[in-house]
Amino acid sequence: MKKMNLVTAALPYVNNIPHLGNLVQVLSADAFARYSKMSGIKTLYVCGTDEYGTATETKALIENTTPLELCNKYYEIHKSIYKWFNIEFDIFGRTTNKNHQDIVQNFFLQLEKNGYIKERETEQFFCNKDSMFLADRYVIGECPECQSMAKGDQCDNCSKLLNPTDLINPKCIICKNKPILKKTNHLYLDLPKIKTKLEKWIKNPDTSKNWNTNALKMTKAFLRDGLKERAITRDLKWGIPVPKKGFENKVFYVWFDAPIGYISITKNIIKNWESWWKNNDQVNLVQFIGKDNILFHTIIFPCIEIGSEENWTILNQLSSSEYLNYENLKFSKSEGTGIFGNDAITTGIPSDIWRFYIYYNRPEKSDFQFMWQDLMERVNTELIDNFSNLVNRVLTFQRKFFGDVIETIEIQNKFWKQITPKYNKILNLFKKTELKSALKEILKISSLGNKIFQDNEPWKRKNNSPQETKELISNLIYLIRDLSILMMPFIPETSKKIQQFFGNSYQFSTKILGTKSGIKKIEFTEILFNKLEQKKINNLKLKYSGDKNMKENEQAENLPIAKEQPENLFREKVLLRVVKINKIERNPEAKNLFILKLDDGTNKDKQIVSGLEGYYTEEELLGKHIIIVDNLKPAKFRGIKSEGMLIAAEDKNKNFKVIIVEDSIQNPIAGERIILENDQNKDLACPPKIDINKFLKANIVAENGELKINGINLILENSKNKILSKDIPNGTVC
């Protein structure tokens, strides 16, 4: 069994400021490395800037500077942004380090010695106007696979690896003129010759079992289509020189040298670097990448290592993610679309909030849309109303009624039997790099803690049963300590602050989870987070939209709804949730209006007003689970605020029935989202506030006793059970 975790995040290009989409990988690796260290595993987290290649050379031309000066500038920018986000690298280096050239050239010489390098005369694009051969990224054109605009090495849209000559209507990126083909010599890595060894390695059950499904599928498809020789040299000035006669004016292709940067960056800092990089039996190499980098990490880099015929530490565990997009657009460095690292710093929103939201929506299986409204709602409900609320209410109650000193507690076995089995599940999710799921399981424990507090009503029992109440609160305090440990990989500054409340030195070890000792006193407490306000979010959304995006958004808003499929409108505009009716009051100003107090899973009552007199008695509805439009703009009815609208079915005879979600049949959970059946396992954004007309245009109907949109069933997100309309089998939903 491997005893050490070597963790890497894809080396970011140092030609621009990183945006939130770029940060997914370094943050993911950071959370895993923190978990690994808390678990007592010897861990090294390595990253750095990828500084050679076409992207840097072209950016330097644009900024009228040298490539090295450009790299120096952006390296410092990257470092400062990662520091603000509390990314705890063990090593953060550069591929322009003193060891990089030697290691890259040694890999090449070893590959050449072993017969895996071929020299080919080839035709390459040449720009007559600029009098230069054009490296792959100096050529742009239409992708032959998906017809999107692409550069000459890879299509960002469909991830297909390309050669510049594959592009349709190619153009020089500098002058935009059409280049000509001209003969030149280049060196190629003979991937077909390494294929047998590569496939043997991939088929080893200890290898690919730890890869994401999308990474394995993409790699197998690439192998199935047949490996081709891959050029490893380029006609550039900025890069690692090729140590071969006749190639003095060429450099290595950036994706030949960049993965080797993981090794050279380590060697540049650590003397015993070989104990990490030449120790495949003991070291578990865990790599975090985006889906556009999959083939370079599962094909190219392993082939370089295998072809060298040395005992390099090779990929064991791969965590690849999909794209994080911005408000229905892609983050784009070149177009300036989306939130960049320096923007996040100036928003006034703490780094732990940004971290939380990115982990909560980590695009593990499908692309995710960053939405400002969703940021506010997820943070306010899950991070603050759930997690932060538990910490505040328990510690405040202890100090107010029982003082700062924590007495030796009586362990409540019933309490901990609900909690401790969940710890192993969470740690296993961390181990498998399923970070989003791990975070959501932690939040479920926090929600359970709130429920235990609420159900036991300590504010009522503190006088009649003071000892039992003390024990309850003390057990909850140790639960909070455990939550601070589990949340440490995600929100480290907040976790440290919680442990500062207890006055102890930091105790971030998974070994103490579930233990009930070590906390003597509460030194102080304070609110962990302030809620995000709607006005602030609106201003930030406007500030970071840009004129072009604002116009596009306005055009999109003004498109006739008739052209939009109802299921798409529902997916993008409507948020339905299950709620439980806890209390019913009559509006004193209008007796036909019921005021419903609802449990929506946030431990904070939600209120809606509905005209149900004559249709139902209070007794018929109390305790029932119903469905509400949760993103309806608030309104007042006879002076009473309503924060949503329940949904009901109506048939052609005007019979009207509220949609009841049956406990015994459908197993609903308060706060659970209602989704389309074909949206299972998708990361869905939280839609903005809407008016009633927008909801009605989603055209939900009851059809043969089931709620549907355009023939697609509505289901409970967790249990996947269909939403039923037993009393009105066929009709409209309003």
From Swiss-Prot:
PROSITE patterns: AA_TRNA_LIGASE_I (PS00178), TRBD (PS50886)
Gene name of the record: metG
Molecular-function GO terms, alphabetical: ATP binding; metal ion binding; methionine-tRNA ligase activity; tRNA binding
Motif interval(s): 'HIGH' region: 12-22
Motif window: 'KMSKS' region: 330-334
EC number: 6.1.1.10
Positions contributing to ATP binding: K333
Cross-referenced PANTHER family: METHIONINE--TRNA LIGASE, METHIONINE--TRNA LIGASE, CYTOPLASMIC
Keywords: Aminoacyl-tRNA synthetase, ATP-binding, Cytoplasm, Ligase, Metal-binding, Nucleotide-binding, Protein biosynthesis, RNA-binding, tRNA-binding, Zinc
InterPro entries for the chain: aa-tRNA-synth_I_CS, Anticodon_Met, Met-tRNA-synth_bsu_C, Met-tRNA_ligase_1, Met-tRNA_synth, Methionyl/Leucyl_tRNA_Synth, MetRS_core, MetRS_Zn
Residues annotated as binding Zn(2+): C143, C146, C155, C158
Family: Belongs to the class-I aminoacyl-tRNA synthetase family. MetG type 1 subfamily.
Ranges in a coiled coil: none
Note describing how the cofactor binds: Binds 1 zinc ion per subunit.
Superkingdom of the source species: Bacteria
BP GO annotations: methionyl-tRNA aminoacylation
Reaction(s) the record says it catalyses: tRNA(Met) + L-methionine + ATP = L-methionyl-tRNA(Met) + AMP + diphosphate
Oligomeric and partner information: Homodimer.
Necessary cofactors: Zn(2+)
Subcellular location: Cytoplasm
Function according to Swiss-Prot or TrEMBL: Is required not only for elongation of protein synthesis but also for the initiation of all mRNA translation through initiator tRNA(fMet) aminoacylation.
HAMAP family: Met_tRNA_synth_type1 (MF_00098)
Protein name, per record: Methionine--tRNA ligase
